[in-house]
Regions:
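Phosphate- and other anionic-substrate recognition elements at nucleic-acid/protein interfaces
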Residues: 1-181
Length: 181
């Protein structure tokens, strides 16, 4: 697990002479990075919202490719956090077997955009491995395992995770839950 914190002088506003507020991370953002990923907001363990990763379509090598939209991500993060003390939990990812160089570069770019937006907004971020958050959440392995676990935990929001392609949403929720533990 890797954690990057904002320097305390920037993170803790002064309340009075020599007193600093103690951050209370009741708002946790879970991030499944990549163009097919998602962002979830939990407040005191309650799922408040989940959003597909903002993307933009660009032309690369004469074909259309989706990639994370920096401006869209910044606007979304701002709308989720506002002035509240928040922490972010992002999946720590590495190269996957059989993944091409171009694909790895694109994915790394997405993670860099996420890290940059969080740093600019002074939101501390912790990176957790997939194995770590899956174990903490009790989800079975695989895309359907995450979706099933989230639907068990949040049955009233099950419609948000009904499609197979909603696995990124489910992962983001479980990542946030793992970070709130």
């Amino acid at each position: 697990m890797t954690t990057y914190n904002v320097p305390q002088a920037m993170q803790l506003p002064t309340l009075g002479v020599g007193q600093a507020s103690t951050p209370s991370f009741s708002r946790v953002i879970g991030i499944d990075p990549g163009a097919s990923g998602a962002i979830a907001l939990l407040v005191q363990g309650v799922l408040l919202s989940v959003h597909d990763m903002p993307t933009v379509t660009v032309e690369r090598n004469k074909s259309q490719k989706r990639q994370v939209c920096p401006a869209g991500l910044s606007i979304l993060i701002e709308s989720l956090t506002g002035p509240y003390v928040t922490k972010a939990i992002c999946e720590k990812v590495g190269a996957r077997p059989g993944q091409g160089v171009s694909s790895m570069f694109s994915f790394g770019r997405s993670v860099g955009i996420i890290e940059g937006v969080l740093a600019a907004k002074q939101i501390p971020v912790t990176f957790v491995t997939p194995q770590s958050w899956q174990k903490l959440s009790g989800a079975a392995k695989g895309k359907d395992g995450s979706r099933q676990r989230v639907m068990e935990l949040f049955p009233r929001e099950a419609h948000l995770f009904a499609r197979v392609k909603d696995d990124g949403r489910a992962d983001a929720v479980l990542i946030a839950l793992a970070g709130g533990i």
